[in-house]
Amino acid sequence: MIEVGTLVRYKSDGDIGLVMKVVEDCGHFVYWIKWGDGSYHSCASRWFEVIA
């Protein structure tokens, strides 16, 4: 599980975001991320990589 406060990079476009919330759903973790443009989106960890 990735922790709240972790910096991540979206794999497809390189956008940087900050993990704001972690929700467990049916045994899988969903991450709410605040992206560099100020938007919030949820996604699974396969769509981003941890950078710090």
Q: What are the residue ranges of the model-derived segments?
A:
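Basic/aromatic-rich interaction segments and small domains that mediate binding to polyanionic partners
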Residues: 3-52
